[in-house]
Amino acid sequence: MISVKDAQGTQYEAAKHFEVYGLQKITEAQSQRTTVCYSYFQPNGGAEMSSSPKERVYYVVKGSITVNGPEEKHVLNEGDLIYIAPGEERDMVVNNGKPAEVLVFIVTP
């Protein structure tokens, strides 16, 4: 088992993200295949359109975000989550000019 307290974690910068900082709570080195991050998005924060070979789940803890695919749009509010399959393109923006906090689960195949 791995237990991580609220303020614990390693600070990281995510590629192709802007106006965001975060803490890696659990890494693949600890769990074998899963990384868990807590991301703090500023009011103008988000992520550029990209894809990844890894599965991802975004869970909105605070605020509101929009996750866009090439032909779809998902508005997520507190308590909502989205699953992103390997290879799916997506971008993300923060809504309403207010910060958002997102718990991110990344699973390596």
Give each language-model segment a name:
Residues 24, 35-52, 86:
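Conserved short histidine dyad/triad with adjacent acidic residue
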Residues 70-86:
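Short acidic-glycine-tyrosine-enriched beta hairpin
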Residues 28, 46-52, 74, 93-95:
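Short histidine-centered beta-strand/loop micro-motifs
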Residues 1-33:
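A short, N-terminal "cap"/entry segment at the start of jelly-roll beta-barrel domains
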Residues 86-109:
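Ligand-binding loop in jelly-roll beta-barrel domains
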Residues 40-41, 52-66:
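Short, conserved beta-strand element in jelly-roll/cupin
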